[in-house]
Amino acid sequence: MRTFTGRLTACLLATGIGGPTMAQTVSPGPSGAVTPVEIAAETINGDLRCRPPRARLPAEERLELRVVNSSERPVAFAAPKFFNASQIVESGGFTWDIAQDRFVVAPRSTVWVRLQSPVPGEYYYSCFEQGQIPTDSTSGFLIVVPAAR
């Protein structure tokens, strides 16, 4: 596996919390600031959960997507259509699995991807444990809406 940053740098591609279970977008601050968007993965009664089921974010703006894994197990995160439609600027904290089109978030870790968000639309995402199939409780949508002007 190659690092996601290396893949992005090589390709320059435009090619996928308010508390542990909520996503939150915060208005950008001064010039150069990015809007943070968080997806939280946690284990509840032995079952993996990812929140929120629907995260709203502005279209065609700089964002920092953070995937926060508060569980004791590694969690894979995939949002291939979202990442393919976005312009990735930089990333950190993970290795991109090119063959599987996902990255893994280590236990009790946070990874981030800074990007220019795509055009408005609904983009499916999923969190899942290695070897498992995503379920309704581990999947959701990144809802990209026209940016407020």
Model-derived regions, located:
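Bacterial N-terminal signal peptides that target proteins for export
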Residues: 1-9
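Bacterial N-terminal signal peptides
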Residues: 9-18
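N-terminal edge beta-strand
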Residues: 32-62
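Beta-strand cores of secreted/periplasmic/IMS beta-sandwich domains, seen most often
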Residues: 53-78, 110-119
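Beta-strand acidic-aromatic groove motif in beta-rich domains, primarily in extracellular
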Residues: 74-81, 124-126
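Short aromatic-acidic-glycine turn motif
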Residues: 83-92
